[in-house]
Amino acid sequence: MKNQTNTNKYNLTNDVIKKEVDDILKGKYQQCVLGTLNQNGYPYLSKTLPLYYEKKIYLLLSDLSDHTENLKINKKVSIYFAQEEIHKERLNNPRLTLLGLIKKLKLNKNDELFRKLLKNYILFD
């Protein structure tokens, strides 16, 4: 009997996984949540719309937002992406969580990077 290749998600090649992650970062998701820690160490989560450009994730955060206040204390963030729920068992639906440190950039509407970010921003269905 020949060896049969199992094509489930657990046996994907690194190239396939990299492509799926890249697709998610480029906008193939339904929801995205940013997580920061408040001054008491509690997680604070809210929906966000990241901008993905040149292999970097950019977030537009108001100086008045709770996340901005939290990031003054702790630069650690988590970003959670959820794709369309296609499986009956909800825990089996595609998702991606990224952890990292955030860096603040001061941009205004006339900055070239800001214009490029908006130009490359993908709107979803």
Name the predicted role of every residue range.
Residues 1-125:
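Binding-site signature for planar aromatic cofactors or substrates
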